[in-house]
Amino acid sequence: MLLRTAAASASSLSLFSPNAEPPRSVPARGLVVRAAKGSTNHRALTGVIFEPFEEVKKELDLVPTVPQASLARQKYVDESESAVNEQINVEYNVSYVYHAMFAYFDRDNVALRGLAKFFKESSEEEREHAEKLMEYQNKRGGKVKLQSIVMPLSDFDHADKGDALHAMELALSLEKLTNEKLLNLHSVATKNGDVQLADFVETEYLGEQVEAIKRISEYVAQLRRVGKGHGVWHFDQMLLHEGGDAA
């Protein structure tokens, strides 16, 4: 016991002795401890060292010096720029048609306020889509070029279907047409390797477009069930109070 205590005391004292050697770690049984041959702190993970001041030179040469040229533009081809401008025109045209439908159903001798509300909101939504595309065009360094808008119809009555069903079927066709145009825009982006434009179309438009087509398809089916009579009034009331009571 005395020998063990003395050995333990000597070991304890050696920890505080300035001349004592540091304790040697003893590897666990079955393990082999090897010292690292060299530090890996400065090794490149891929074997390629990034040299920003060298690699940025070619980009620096591409920075425009004329005031008319965009400074933000990068990997944004003319075809993509034109396709975005075309989609802006599509959104504005559809918005204009929906606005005409709003005006029709808001007439005193038509008086379907729910349908008027629905088409007014739809018109505003399409205009927002156009404005979002315009903002994106500027963000990528493109130039917004607004095109002419076709004058829409002012009357939407139909002898066989009635005005509500006729207008809703037209709206469904417009949403499907808009979806086709968006898919074309996405194809242009994909063809030119513009992953940012493709992501923008996917994130901001395509999913929402599918939802709109489904919603209006259900409205068409419901209007076909109720016919042109009293059921249209009940359908209109549903739209009027959808999302909260109307003023």
From Swiss-Prot:
It is found in: Plastid, Chloroplast. Residues 74-227 form the Ferritin-like diiron domain. GO terms for cellular component: chloroplast; cytoplasm. Residues 41-73 are annotated as: Extension peptide (EP). Residues 1-40 form a transit peptide. Gene3D superfamilies: 1.20.1260.10. Its main location: plastid. It is an enzyme of class 1 (oxidoreductase). It catalyses: 4 Fe(2+) + O2 + 4 H(+) = 4 Fe(3+) + 2 H2O. Fe cation 2 binds at residues 126, 175, 209. Keywords: Chloroplast, Iron, Iron storage, Metal-binding, Oxidoreductase, Plastid, Transit peptide. Fe cation 1 binds at residues 91, 126, 129. The keyword Transmembrane helix does not apply. Its EC number is 1.16.3.1. GO terms for biological process: intracellular iron ion homeostasis; iron ion transport. PROSITE patterns: FERRITIN_2, FERRITIN_LIKE. GO terms for molecular function: ferric iron binding; ferrous iron binding; ferroxidase activity. CDD domains: Euk_Ferritin. Oligomer of 24 subunits. There are two types of subunits: L (light) chain and H (heavy) chain. The major chain can be light or heavy, depending on the species and tissue type. The functional molecule forms a roughly spherical shell with a diameter of 12 nm and contains a central cavity into which the insoluble mineral iron core is deposited. Belongs to the ferritin family. Stores iron in a soluble, non-toxic, readily available form. Important for iron homeostasis. Has ferroxidase activity. Iron is taken up in the ferrous form and deposited as ferric hydroxides after oxidation. This is Ferritin-4, chloroplastic.
